[in-house]
UniProtKB/Swiss-Prot annotation:
InterPro entries: Hem25/SLC25A38 (IPR030847), Mitochondrial_sb/sol_carrier (IPR018108), Mt_carrier_dom_sf (IPR023395). GO terms for molecular function: glycine transmembrane transporter activity. HAMAP family: SLC25A38. The chain crosses the membrane at residues 27-52, 79-105, 139-164, 192-215, 238-264, 293-311. It is found in: Mitochondrion inner membrane. PANTHER family: MITOCHONDRIAL GLYCINE TRANSPORTER. Signal peptide: none annotated. This is Mitochondrial glycine transporter.
């Protein structure tokens, strides 16, 4: 067996039934990967929200305050339902859209797809289930897919942030949604979308760009190993490490947008819009306020992205092999 046989994605005969089933499976794989990462990493997400809501909020006192509350340790998982819905269905929409965009670009004839040689290096096949695109195409497809998914899931995101925050004493998600609609109208459910899009578009674009580049480099190193079995076992490792590193880099670059987004969603009447929020945050809390929650966000994003993408790619690769043998 050659090295390329380990990573190569089987060619599946294009039929309408196959296209439909593959789209459904991309959605299901994205949902599964998103749900698993959201539930496991909810404490980090909740702590990030609490730290970002005020520059004076330190991590350790925040943890002690939550644990000493009546709910105890369970308080760290407050907001898990909206977080799981947002991340689960958001990931499902994102991966489905990303696959559709990449498949579409790869078959348009536009020079955005890498050749087999340039994509894989010297005989190294890819551990990815997605088509190989150029750097600019990776950037564009990642950004477009994330913004589209973010817009659809925005109401759930606002509910999640409000419910996790200590600013509001919502007893349930229903009461949170009812209060937002009563006091702010439908617009309130989309508070902070501008900052979210400004964060998500570059983040997702940079993530896909870094992720694909890192995978090619790590695959080149794995190719110098000793045989096919070592390559098989390293496929998931390549995806996981690449995902964690790519998320860390993209998160560090885009964290100011995340800090602004959180303030806008918590106090839309005070901050108004993205530019006003930046000015007020810097004036009241200093430039450091734009880096609030960076450590927590890097930790959570690195783990969640690595987990989500590894689970997603492994499920898709297994499905591709199944479809190939069936056809």
């Amino acid at each position: 067996m050659s090295n390329s046989a380990v990573y190569a994605v089987p060619q599946v005969k294009k039929t309408s039934a196959t296209t439909t089933s593959k789209t459904t499976f991309h959605f299901a794989a994205g949902l599964c990967s998103g749900l698993s990462s959201a539930i496991l990493l909810q404490p980090a997400d909740l702590l990030k929200t609490r730290v970002q809501q005020s520059q004076n909020a330190a991590l350790l006192p925040t943890i002690k305050s939550i644990i000493s509350s009546p709910n105890g340790i369970r308080g760290l998982w407050r907001g898990t339902l909206p977080s799981a819905l947002r991340t689960g269905f958001g990931s499902a929409l994102y991966f489905t859209s990303l696959n559709a965009l990449r498949q579409g670009l790869a078959h348009t004839g536009v020079p955005v797809a890498l050749s087999s040689a340039s994509a894989n290096g010297k005989g190294v096949a890819s551990s990815s289930a997605l088509p190989k695109l150029s750097n600019s195409a990776n950037l564009a497809t990642g950004a477009a897919a994330r913004v589209a998914a973010g817009f659809v899931m925005m109401p759930v995101t606002v509910l999640k942030v409000r419910y996790e925050s200590s600013y509001y004493a919502y007893g349930s998600l229903y009461s949170a949604g009812r209060d937002i609609l009563r006091t702010e109208g439908v617009r309130g459910l989309f508070a902070g979308f501008g900052a979210t899009a400004a964060r998500d578009a570059p983040y997702a674009g940079l993530y896909v760009l870094f992720y694909e580049q890192l995978k090619r480099r790590f695959a080149s190193l794995a190719d110098s190993g000793t045989g096919d079995q070592s390559l098989k076992s390293s496929s998931s490792s390549i995806n996981f490490v690449s995902g964690a590193l790519a998320a860390g880099l993209a998160t560090a670059i885009t964290n100011p947008f995340d800090a602004v987004k959180t303030r806008l969603q918590l106090m839309p009447n005070k901050y108004g819009n993205m530019m006003r929020a930046v000015k007020l945050m810097v004036h009241e809390d200093g430039v450091r306020s734009l880096l609030g929650g960076l450590g927590l966000r890097i930790t959570r994003k690195a783990l969640s992205s690595a987990l989500a993408w590894t689970v997603y790619e492994e499920l898709i690769l297994r499905a591709e092999k199944h479809w190939a043998t069936r056809d």
